[in-house]
Amino acid sequence: MSILNSGSCMMTDTNQNMECKVDFKKGEFDLQPLQINQFGFTKTQLHKPLTRNLSNKEDTHVPKRQKVSEPYFRGETERNVKSHQDRAASIYHEAMNGASGIHKQMSLPEYSPQMGNSWEIQVPMTTRHSISETPTKPFTATTAIAGSAGSLPRNTTIGLPGPSALLKHESGKNENQVRVCLYHKHYSRWYLPFDKDDDNQLVEAYAKYFSSENRPSIFYVLQGISFGPECEYVLRRKHWWNPWAEKVMRREIVERKIDTHPGCRTVAERYEQIEASGSEELLIIPIYKINMWVLSLLLFSAGGSVLIGLWMRLSDPSFAHGMLLNLGIGSIGSFLYLLSNTWCR
């Protein structure tokens, strides 16, 4: 059965496709088989791909673009979060599975100038539980310092976070545990809890492994970690553009309250407000020790600039006054620049 529509129709058969053409003058039907090639195009469409087939009536109506609704964006956000969680889980499982009985050798730099040679840390991350179980169960990590005499490997139990802990900040309940904040090249930051029995070498080893950088020198060495109420100790990157910042060493960590609330004139007022509200907003400020050659270089340059300015002031009073002021401001600015790159980082 065929249907007429504007002088053309299509007749479908089970064996072959037939093209139905109507001649209005003769009132007859002209049935011709469609010559379809292997790509699904007719002969007319193959020679003239940009012209439409006159045997078929095409709908030229273009529908309006639908307005993107808010649930669509919400769904996209949920999918992005899901993908990030999957990536975090894959890295976590890779770290755990990479550790099925395999000893990972981690070469670390010297921690003190008194040590004559560098030492290495072996971290055989042997899991005591499968990945399908709760990931917050601890596993045993062994550290062996090869460079120091008389040291023996010791076992340390550490509770590593699961994949969900890599993406969100969760407050801990263990008073003998500290959370170290690491920077990852795929994620903004993630946390690793360490107990008071863990030393700085183990912190540095895990910082190297979980950062996926294979360059432990980009992290500062944590010295003098005091394990008290849980707070964030951050392993910061070194400034690659500042050679003076590569020479500093972190000696201790001081806890200070954040003084950013409007209306607070002193840190003590902000501390009282935080204590009254019961919230814990802590800012970890690292204290650095400047090398003596850097400090002597700054003092020498500042003193030299002042002496040159005084000499120019005595030789030409009309000209050297502005030069002395510029040199003094420059020396003070250079000193403040060094302080900003060492203490205020």
Curated annotation (Swiss-Prot):
This is Meiotically up-regulated gene 97 protein. The keyword Membrane applies. The chain crosses the membrane at residues 292-312, 319-329. The keyword 4Fe-4S does not apply. It is a multi-pass membrane protein. GO terms for biological process: chromosome segregation; meiotic cell cycle; sporulation resulting in formation of a cellular spore. GO terms for cellular component: membrane.
